[in-house]
Regions:
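Short helices/loops that flank or line small-molecule/ion binding pockets
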Residues: 42, 65-77, 164-178, 183
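A structural signal for short loop-to-beta-strand junctions that line the ligand-binding cleft
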Residues: 95-103
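C-terminal motif of bacterial Sec signal peptides marking the signal peptidase cleavage site
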Residues: 15-18
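A ligand-binding cleft/hinge motif common to bilobed small-molecule-binding domains
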Residues: 73, 81-93, 143, 147-149, ...
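Structural recognition of the beta-strand scaffold that forms the well-ordered cores
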Residues: 58-59, 78-83, 109-111, 130-132, ...
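Sec-dependent signal peptide recognition
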Residues: 2-10
C-alpha cells in the first residue's frame, strides 16, 4: 500500500505546487478513524510531512464521501477521498472539483450475522438496518438499493451508523444488518 501511496503523493504534491503559501496547512478529508479512507489519508499525510515541503498535511476525520465533497466545496479541506459515483455527480454541479486518481474499486455490501435469516433484500422487511453514517457514500448507496428493491422506509427500520458502530450493534443484536460500501478486502 505504501508504494501506491508514494506514487499518489508525487501526483498530488505536483498538482498542489504553487497552490499553497509557505507554512500553510493542507487539510485532508478522510472518514472515520479505523476505516480505509482514514488509513490511506493518515499514511499519505505522514509521507508528505516527511518530505520537508513548505507546508504540512493534516488529516480531518469526516463522515465520509458526501461530507468530503461538501467540505471541499466549503473550503474546509483541500483534498478529500470520495466514491467515484459521488464525485461524478458532484462535478455536474461544481466544475471546480477535480479528481486526482482512483484509489481502489468499492462495492456496496450487506453485512449480516452468520446465523441470520436474512438472505435477500426482501428479507430486510421488519428488520433494523444501518444504512451508513449521515453524510457517507454508504448512506447514498444503501438508500438507492432499498428504493430500487421497492423497500420503503415503512418496511425497514433504519439507523445511521458508521462501520465501527454498526459492527458493534450487529454483534450485540441491536441491528440485524448493515450496508458497507468499501473495498472488497475491507475488514468489518
Amino acid at each position: 500500500m505504501k508504494k501506491k501511496i508514494s506514487i499518489m503523493l508525487c501526483i498530488v504534491l505536483f498538482a498542489l505546487t504553487g497552490c499553497t503559501n509557505s507554512g500553510s496547512t493542507i487539510r485532508f478529508g478522510a472518514a472515520d478513524v479505523g476505516g480505509m479512507y482514514y488509513s490511506f489519508a493518515n499514511t499519505f499525510t505522514e509521507l508528505a510531512n516527511e518530505q520537508g515541503y513548505d507546508f504540512t498535511c493534516k488529516v480531518r476525520t469526516t463522515a465520509g464521501s458526501n461530507a468530503n465533497i461538501r467540505l471541499l466545496s466549503d473550503d474546509y479541506i483541500e483534498i478529500g477521498i470520495a466514491q467515484a459515483d459521488l464525485i461524478a455527480d458532484a462535478y455536474k454541479t461544481n466544475e471546480d472539483l477535480r479528481a486526482i486518481a482512483g484509489l481502489y474499486t468499492e462495492t456496496c455490501q450487506l453485512v449480516v450475522r452468520a446465523d441470520s435469516d436474512i438472505q435477500t433484500l426482501d428479507d430486510l422487511s421488519g428488520h433494523t438496518v444501518s444504512i451508513g453514517a449521515k453524510e457517507s457514500g454508504t448512506k447514498r448507496n444503501a438508500t438507492q438499493i432499498l428504493e430500487f428493491a421497492g423497500m420503503p422506509s415503512s418496511l425497514v427500520a433504519t439507523k445511521n451508523l458508521d462501520y465501527i458502530e454498526a459492527t458493534k450493534e450487529l454483534k450485540a443484536g441491536d441491528i440485524d444488518a448493515f450496508f458497507c460500501t468499501a473495498g472488497l478486502t475491507t475488514t468489518v
